[in-house]
Amino acid sequence: MPVSMAVCETANVVNAALRESLGGNSSAAGSSADQAKSGEESNGSLQNHIVANAKRILMAKIEYEEVPNYHESVLESLKSKYIVIKPGNPGAINGFGGKNNTGKVVGANGHDNNGARKQAEHPNNQSHHNNHNNHPHPTSNPNELPKPKRVLYPRENIRIGWKQSERKWQVGTGMINVGNTCYLNSTLQALLHIPALANWLVSEQAHLENCNVAESGGGCIVCAMAKTLLATQSNQSAVRPFLIYSKLKQICKHMVVGRQEDAHEFLRFLVEAMERAYLMRFRNYKELDQLVKETTPLGQIFGGYLRSEVRCLSCNHVSITFQHFQDLLLDIRKADTLEDAFEGHFSRERLEDMGYKCEGCKKKVSATKQFSLERAPITLCIQLKRFSMIGNKLTKQISFKPRIDLSKYAARSPAAQAQPLTYRLVSMVTHLGVSQHCGHYTAIGSTDTGSYYNFDDSYVRPIAMQSVCNTNAYIMFYELDLSQTASPAANRPNGMRLTNGHSTTPVPATTVSSPSPTRFIGPQLPPGGVNGYSNGNAQKTAIQFKQHHQQSQQNGFQLGTGKFQDTAKPPLVGAHAKGEANPAPTANGNKSSSTSSNNSSSSNHKSINQQQYLPISSEDEDSEDERTSRPSTVQLPSMPKMTDDHTEKPKSPVKIQAKTPIKTPLKSLVPYESASEEEEAPLPNPRKRRSGEDSSESDQESGQTNGHSKTNGSLTNGSASSSVHVNNSKLKTDAIDEIFKSLKKSADSDDDDDEEESSIQLTNGWHPQKQSQSQSKAPPSPKTPPSPAVIKSKTGIWKVTRNDEVDDIDDDDDEEEEATVKIQTPSKTHRNPFSSSKPSTDSPATPGAKRQKLLNGSPVKSHQQPRVGNGYQSEATSNGSTINELLKQSHRGYGSSVLSWNGKPAELEKETFELVCAKRIAGHGSVDGSDIVESSVAVNASSGSDSNDVVVIAVALLVDAREQRQRDLDDDEENEMDRGRQRKVKSGSAKGNNASNSTPGYNPFQEYEGQKRWNKNGGGGGGFPRFYNQNFRQNFQQRNKFKFNRFGGPGGAKFQQQRALQRHLAAGGGFSRRQPSAQQQQQQS
């Protein structure tokens, strides 16, 4: 071992004697030197001085110590004076001895350097003392992370991921709780399901065989962990972790067997015990410095380094230090997500005012402090601060994602920028309870197949990813995801082999490159570019694109836009063309040029295909979905070019009429779809159809919205003549109104355009209303969609219809009405339910045949006056199957009725028979329905119908009106039970075996509210109302005793008949037309 004495250069006795002899008398020494050089005089006087001084020096006691080399003896003491280097000093040599603005020579840390001028005058002397700065050494640059002198376990030997091991990994068995050891079981399960740690433990087979630590026959703590891992992999039943449980006192002295402990505290002591056990393999482990001790396998797996920058607010002096960590403790008091907690941890914080002593100012000043990742760990351990010092627990829900990216928290150093920072969730520890001293710990771990399992002591069960993300986590383990950060060898010569934090300078990403000579004609997309964005290198992966994008944002660069066009073409100019690259339009797909709801289905399919190449993460997609931007679609040479104009017509080979721009994006509250799966047709706006005028006779094709018609995913001008006028009224921005777009057409009074009229196929048996010229001055009537909306839900496909339609019961003689109106009906095809069809000729047909054609989808002409029924129109004549078809399409008994799309009843007038009926259904008008009868008689007087038919119609309308009022007044708790997803079955009695003895209005869903069963003496109440019937429970009577007073008071077969009809309809059965009894005719008359 080399020896260096404490006196350094004076160790040589001869040299010391010479210096002391010559230094005693400068003049004599100078003359003696001259005499010695010239050789003219003898050197006797010099010898005398040397002998005298040598004797004294040899007799002096010299203290020395053994050191490895000269640097650690002398230069290590000097290193403490130059810990901090002042950045941005161009005049400094190697960061030392530079001049500041005032001309004062300062050191690297901002202090006065008295020896700086001397070192500058004697560069050789400086290079001698600072020789260690001229070659790689732990103190090469204090602004960089120092390298350890010795690496105990190379970082490159850590195998990341389950696939890196040749072993076939199993899910693992549970662990038996031997008495308040759930914290130990859950911590062990979380650790053993970390791939990097499990692979290292399996690789310690040689140490297991030769372990010389005999502690209770189980070896060291590392051997105990490895044996526990092998036991969980090989056994079929739950194991007892006695090897770890027996060493609890060795792991932590203050932990008591059988007492509940904190899982994170046990985790920290367990990892430290494993590190100590590994260091004991080396003889001089106590003499190792801290940097070397941090290179153990546990330190390489869990260890990382944080860069701490403290900036003085007075002189802007920055003090940089590095801190080793094995877990991040995140404060969640002001965070709702894991990203918020990271933002708070790595944000710049202000220290206590006048509480930091600046090394440059030499006084206490205000300063700021900020952390950044200098070297990220392979396995990131995150502990959420849920417990306080007194044991209270913060039980708030913190949402997190299975994959996180920490690249924005990396330090601004080359070594930090070159490392991968994409992590995936591998295991976690959860706590159930209200405090630290009680509760239960469980663990969640991943397997080599990517699935997750919940480990609750000895119970092991699979768990879904959604449940994992909704877990109230306490400790989380994320591991580097090499599959997401793998890059070509051109940028990283060593592949993904992790260095010790000091790798070569990464190749800078180029954002502009020469265009590819190949021009793609088809809809293909290269891996490098999406939606007009391209990083100029087709062989780079998606994660590289994101990293380059983030770096370009920091450096102020902008990504180029190729768009499969020639280089001479200008780049895309949009809302995102600013000082930084913004791939927001790529996240939410391609939008239409007017940002309206008239998006073609082809662009929607294109956006779905393009999202497969998106280079940004899912969280960016979620946040960017709400933005509205100009189009950034890929323009191919074979595709029509569209401009970014929002108001004018785009220049395109296809005639396109872009109109009605909407500033707010279209957001659907429910997934409405048309009857065809291939295209989505816009639905009318209820506010527009209330405020707009009636649609008169026009010669345009159906399915047009604001003058367009959807044809094969593109907007084409589908109007047939110039008589179509688009109403440019103000668009409504209500949330519900955004779902619909109405068709407003002005009235056209020409009678000679019968040959140009297009008959439209009936959808679900409904006709849109069309009034004749004589009724053109009538008050506006509602405009209705051709077909009910189709809703896709988890329970199936639903159609939204009204449950209070008008049940028409007319005879076959009503086909001879005077008012002949030609109805325009939408034709439904397999491609577009709103597309038009050729005009059909007028052919008379019987009502039965006409109804059959309507049901089969054939376009016909209607010669009858259409009737309005609560916002929908139906034909005036029908056969006996009309009501059955209506009842089959209705949703009676499925919940509360839908009055209109905005929740309000339709505003209809009373001037026609249909409007009066709608008022009846909405609950207006007289109680006995006399005005309905009068209106029906007045309307049908000219048709020559029998009075019996009129009475039948009036009775049916009155019954339906009463049913609607009854449904509107049902208890809220009945409607809130299932929200219409399950059909309510109303049986007649407690046993439900006799429909004749059924109690009106009884609902089995309300049985849980009653405490006693009603009597079984059954039977109806004769002529008494329901609240006089003794078969009802008292609480049921109390809630419903005021509901039926407005039906005419007690008594009467009229009430019983009405209730019987309601029970029949509620049971789901249809009913055929029946002749009214004489008693009913007498009551109605």
Curated annotation (Swiss-Prot):
Modified residues (Phosphoserine): 514, 516, 674, 676, 749, 781, 787, 843
USP domain segment(s): 173-481
Polar residues bias spans: 532-542, 705-730, 822-844, 859-884
Residue spans of biased composition, Acidic residues class: 749-758, 805-818
Ranges of compositional bias, category Low complexity: 23-36, 503-518, 588-609, 768-778, 987-998, 1056-1066
Modification type Phosphothreonine: residues: 660, 664, 784, 825, 846
GO biological process terms on file: germ-line stem cell population maintenance; heterochromatin formation; negative regulation of antimicrobial peptide production; negative regulation of innate immune response; negative regulation of macroautophagy; negative regulation of peptidoglycan recognition protein signaling pathway; positive regulation of proteasomal protein catabolic process; protein deubiquitination
Transmembrane segments: none
Keywords assigned: Hydrolase, Nucleus, Phosphoprotein, Protease, Thiol protease, Ubl conjugation pathway
SUPFAM superfamilies tied to this protein: Cysteine proteinases
Record field: compositional bias (Pro residues): 779-788
GO molecular function: cysteine-type deubiquitinase activity; K63-linked deubiquitinase activity
InterPro entries associated with the record: Papain-like_cys_pep_sf, Peptidase_C19, Peptidase_C19_UCH, USP_CS, USP_dom
Chain intervals for the UniProt region annotation (Disordered): 23-47, 104-149, 489-730, 745-888, 963-1030, 1043-1085
EC nos: 3.4.19.12
GO cellular component term of the entry, any: cytosol
UniProt key word Phosphoprotein: yes
Basic and acidic residues bias: start-end ranges: 642-651
Parts forming coiled coils: none
Subcellular compartments: Nucleus, Nucleolus
Catalytic activity reported: Thiol-dependent hydrolysis of ester, thioester, amide, peptide and isopeptide bonds formed by the C-terminal Gly of ubiquitin (a 76-residue protein attached to proteins as an intracellular targeting signal)
One family name in Pfam for this protein: UCH
Stored PANTHER family: UBIQUITIN CARBOXYL-TERMINAL HYDROLASE, UBIQUITIN CARBOXYL-TERMINAL HYDROLASE 36
Stated role: Required for maintaining multiple types of adult stem cells, including male and female germline, epithelial follicle cell and intestinal stem cells. May function as a transcriptional repressor by continually deubiquiting histone H2B at the promoters of genes critical for cellular differentiation, thereby preventing histone H3 'Lys-4' trimethylation (H3K4). Controls selective autophagy activation by ubiquitinated proteins.
Family per record: Belongs to the peptidase C19 family.
Name of the protein: Ubiquitin carboxyl-terminal hydrolase 36
Organism annotation: Drosophila erecta (Fruit fly)
